[in-house]
Amino acid sequence: AQIEHFHIDPSRADQIYPARGAWVGSPIEQMGKDVRVAYDKAAAAANAKVIPVGEAWNLAMSTGVADTNPYDGIDTGKLNLWTFDNYHASTYGYYLEALVIFGSVTGRDPRSLGDNECSGYELGISTAEVRKLQQVAFDQLKEMGPIVANPLVLPKPVSPERCAAQ
C-alpha cells in the first residue's frame, strides 16, 4: 500500500515583515496556520497525511530555539531557519525539516539519531544545535500524533564523524 504525504511549507519571513508581504502585520505563526488549513483540505481530498514541518518551525521560534525575524538581525543564541533570501530554508531549516519528515515517515524519535549524527556534522551544525533541533522535531511530532520517545539508541561516538569514508 502506498501512503501519500504532504509536508507543510514553513512561514516565509519575506511575506510577513516587508511591507509588500501578503501576511504583513500578522504574527509569524499565522502564515503557518493558514497554510496548514489549505494543506489539510488537500490531504483530506487525497487521503494523505500532512507532515508538520511548518508547525515545527513555529515551535522552534516560540520556544526560543530559532529567531522569528531575520530582517532585524538574529538574536544571540538563536538559529536562523531562513537563508539569505528570507524565503528558502537555511541549513538549520532544512535539517529541522528532514528531522520532522524522518520522524513522521518512520515513526521513530528524531532524537534517536543522537547529537553526533553525521548529517548534522557534515552540514556544520554543532552538537548543541543538533540536539535542540532534534528536540523541537520530537516535540512537534509528539504533539501531532503517536511517536514513541526513544532518545539516542545508536552508539554515540566521542566526537561527530563523517557519514561515509572518503
List where the protein language model places each region.
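Cell wall/extracellular polymer interaction/catalysis modules
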Residues: 2-5, 28
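Short glycine-enriched loops at secondary-structure junctions
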Residues: 4-6, 56-57
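Acidic carboxylate-rich catalytic motifs and surrounding loops in phosphoryl-/glycosyl-chemistry enzymes
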Residues: 52-58, 115-117
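Conserved catalytic region of serine esterases and O-acyltransferases that act on ester linkages
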Residues: 71-166
